[in-house]
């Protein structure tokens, strides 16, 4: 099962790199969001996809699940949600000001830098 998850994580990473390299600001934001999801999937897979009980020590239980990767992923999901929301608001404001979401057209004129 781990090998399938590694391949899925690799496919998600390649799709996200493709999106990040595009010219549309919304596609770049979705690419970074997808990249965080791919990294989260990779980390949870490396933490081990095994069956066990919660890490509360009880008599008669031999295998426990490691809670550290799960806590790390939960924190990463919250941070990714906050940054994605910020980037979307920033992209909306940029679109309202400039009238485009193409990053090639957002470049300033060389005359603006001299002042």
From Swiss-Prot:
Cellular component terms per the entry's GO annotation: plasma membrane
Location relative to the cell: Cell membrane
Gene3D superfamilies attached to this UniProt entry: 1.10.287.3510
Keyword Lyase assigned: no
Membrane topology: Multi-pass membrane protein
Acetylation is among the record's keywords: no
Origin: domain of life: Bacteria
Example GO biological process: proton transmembrane transport
TM spans (from-to): 1-21, 28-48, 72-92
Keyword set, alphabetical order: Antiport, Cell membrane, Hydrogen ion transport, Ion transport, Membrane, Sodium, Sodium transport, Transmembrane, Transmembrane helix, Transport
One GO MF term attached to the UniProt entry: monoatomic cation transmembrane transporter activity
UniProt family annotation: Belongs to the CPA3 antiporters (TC 2.A.63) subunit C family.
Function as written in the Swiss-Prot or TrEMBL entry: Mnh complex is a Na(+)/H(+) antiporter involved in Na(+) excretion.
NCBIfam families: 2a6301s03, PRK08600.1, PRK09094.1, PRK12660.1
The protein's assembly and partners: May form a heterooligomeric complex that consists of seven subunits: mnhA1, mnhB1, mnhC1, mnhD1, mnhE1, mnhF1 and mnhG1.
Protein name as catalogued: Na(+)/H(+) antiporter subunit C1
